[in-house]
């Protein structure tokens, strides 16, 4: 289900502070490491690189214009598909 329109998009406060610090040139422009997969991508994030945790490792996500409005977790898959079970000795 979609979030109610009367509510603002969710962004973790600590993540937003890191983004604002980079945009104001208070800290060097390097990837922002985050565990907050549920944070919504704002237009301010365009051009920044986030390292989003997928449960095992951090996945680099470079934010482009098309990603605005989506969640950070959508771009860091948590599951790997290894194929359906097949009889390997059947060949």
Swiss-Prot record:
SUPFAM superfamilies: Ribosomal protein S19 (SSF54570). InterPro entries: Ribosomal_uS19, Ribosomal_uS19_bac-type, Ribosomal_uS19_CS, Ribosomal_uS19_SF. One of its GO terms (cellular component) is small ribosomal subunit. Coiled coil: none annotated. GO terms for biological process: ribosomal small subunit assembly; translation. It comes from the Bacteria. GO terms for molecular function: rRNA binding; structural constituent of ribosome. Keywords: Ribonucleoprotein, Ribosomal protein, RNA-binding, rRNA-binding. Protein S19 forms a complex with S13 that binds strongly to the 16S ribosomal RNA. Belongs to the universal ribosomal protein uS19 family. PANTHER family: RIBOSOMAL PROTEIN S19P FAMILY MEMBER (PTHR11880), SMALL RIBOSOMAL SUBUNIT PROTEIN US19M (PTHR11880:SF8). This is Small ribosomal subunit protein uS19. The lineage of its organism: Bacteria, Bacillati, Mycoplasmatota, Mycoplasmoidales, Metamycoplasmataceae.
């Amino acid at each position: 289900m979609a979030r109610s329109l009367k509510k603002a998009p969710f962004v973790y406060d600590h993540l937003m502070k890191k983004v604002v610090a980079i945009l104001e040139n208070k800290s060097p422009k390097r990837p922002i490491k985050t565990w907050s997969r549920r944070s919504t991508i704002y237009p301010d994030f365009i051009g920044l690189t986030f390292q989003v945790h997928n449960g095992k490792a951090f996945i680099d996500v470079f934010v482009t214009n098309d990603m605005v409005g989506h969640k950070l977790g959508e771009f860091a898959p948590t599951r790997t598909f290894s194929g359906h079970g097949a009889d390997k000795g059947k060949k």
